[in-house]
């Protein structure tokens, strides 16, 4: 049965740890990181059109239509598949831009998977992930939809099964420039690689944290406040800060104390993304 319209979630991710092993000749950094999803994110609605036009109806401040990763993902998939159909796209955006929780990458992956379904292309996960990698290093993990240990620039993925606590995520009102952090001379770039799987507990360090905390007082403040209740971590290069709790009630309790002065949300960690659970339910 063909569908005309489809609404899919576009979940956030956390980097439970992030180690920087060195800088490559192409300027990118060799990383090791552990990705986990949150049952929290944007919602994207797709509606088929038969004239081949790709149109995103939701405007993003400061982002031209054709520069949006959602539009880029749709156009690349259309070009490479030879599909003659078009798509109308709307997004209910709640994930912050530049927060380190994968908003743009997740949107691109949801677009690839949603259009593969609506356009009935029959592309497998490997092919979609390879296309996703041309859009951004974090897109493949969202395409594959499973918590993973990532290496290289983040594209070599091994499934992992970390605990799935409740998280309180704080969102400092500042956008961190990833390029700025990775070019900081004080950034640690020589962490020894982790060679055992699963990733041993206790490897929860983010090598970007000292640099981000030094440059951005808003992030430093969030880390200090959350750190009074649980281990406070940085996801990606920030700006979002998070901590795990054994129950929703405990996360909610701390959230009530901290969100008087800080923006934040409580969400369940998940090793299978809510996007993939939704797609499975459509089969």
Curated annotation (Swiss-Prot):
The source's superkingdom equals Bacteria
Q: Which GO terms describe its biological process?
A: isopentenyl diphosphate biosynthetic process, methylerythritol 4-phosphate pathway; terpenoid biosynthetic process
Q: Does the keyword Nucleotidyltransferase apply?
A: no
> What EC numbers are recorded for this enzyme?
2.7.1.148
Q: What's in the keyword line of the UniProt record? A: ATP-binding, Isoprene biosynthesis, Kinase, Nucleotide-binding, Transferase
Task: Give the catalytic activity.
Answer: 4-CDP-2-C-methyl-D-erythritol + ATP = 4-CDP-2-C-methyl-D-erythritol 2-phosphate + ADP + H(+)
Q: Which InterPro entries match?
A: GHMP_kinase_C_dom (IPR013750), GHMP_kinase_C_sf (IPR036554), GHMP_kinase_N_dom (IPR006204), IspE (IPR004424), Ribosomal_Su5_D2-typ_SF (IPR020568), Ribsml_uS5_D2-typ_fold_subgr (IPR014721)
The record's annotation in NCBIfam families points to: ispE
What is this protein called in UniProt? 4-diphosphocytidyl-2-C-methyl-D-erythritol kinase
Species name for this entry?
A: Pseudomonas fluorescens (strain ATCC BAA-477 / NRRL B-23932 / Pf-5)
Q: What is the lineage of its organism?
A: Bacteria, Pseudomonadati, Pseudomonadota, Gammaproteobacteria, Pseudomonadales
